[in-house]
């Protein structure tokens, strides 16, 4: 049961944008892809189709490398990062900590493509039949020279070997200086030993307060 819970922790803390406090095992590859669909009428910001592609690979037991590709602002901004995630302290402790550094680019029709730097800090804690996690980061660009913060807070519960649920609050500062907040409940189905399907909803708490359903596929090799 402990290994099942740890596997779920690793999977969910990896989604949507940051490697979490739990390191990927050495040699393990994780890939997640998905997006939103069935948008509510008028939904544009902060909830849109928002397709994502995310991958992690365990270089060592303490270094996880990955890529993070996504769109934002009604699909008008495309961002891609390569990152390294490094845990701090005891890898078997109940409370886990990690730092994350990333280098990337942002493309938009409003200005030339710019280089980005991102720094992050994560905390996670295993609890009975589940976990808590907080992932924070700040991004700065060579053109947009403002540090823009982001925070995702997640509560997850492992019901059995097949089903897991999560509730995530996503907050941050957008590219146009708007402050956004979204909440996302999700059900995760362990379809095969190396494949999980996550389906849920996203509800904007700011902006036009639009909503959507979301679907993601997670693969582990």
Where are the model-predicted features located?
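Cleavable N-terminal export/targeting peptides
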Residues: 1-26
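Transmembrane beta-barrel domains of Gram-negative outer membranes and organellar outer membranes
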Residues: 18-150, 154-221
């Amino acid at each position: 049961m402990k290994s099942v819970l740890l596997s779920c922790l690793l999977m969910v803390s990896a989604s949507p944008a940051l490697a979490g406090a739990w390191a990927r095992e050495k040699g393990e590859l994780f890939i997640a892809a998905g997006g939103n669909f069935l948008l509510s009428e008028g939904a544009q910001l902060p909830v849109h189709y928002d397709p994502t592609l995310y991958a992690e690979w365990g270089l060592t037991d303490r270094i996880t490398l990955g890529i993070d590709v996504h769109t934002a602002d009604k699909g008008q901004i495309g961002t891609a990062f390569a990152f390294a995630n490094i845990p701090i302290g005891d890898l078997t402790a109940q409370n886990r900590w990690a730092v994350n550094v990333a280098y990337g680019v942002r493309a938009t029709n409003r200005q030339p493509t710019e280089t980005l730097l991102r720094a992050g800090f994560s905390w996670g804690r295993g609890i009975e039949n589940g976990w808590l996690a907080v992932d924070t980061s700040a991004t700065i660009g060579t053109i947009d020279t403002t540090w823009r913060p982001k925070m995702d807070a997640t509560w997850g519960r492992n019901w059995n070997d097949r089903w897991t649920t999560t509730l995530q609050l996503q907050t941050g500062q957008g590219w146009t200086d708007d402050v956004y907040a979204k909440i996302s409940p999700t059900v995760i189905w362990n379809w095969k030993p190396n494949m999980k399907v996550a389906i849920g909803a996203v509800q904007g708490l700011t902006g036009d307060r639009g909503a959507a359903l979301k679907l993601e596929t997670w693969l582990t090799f």
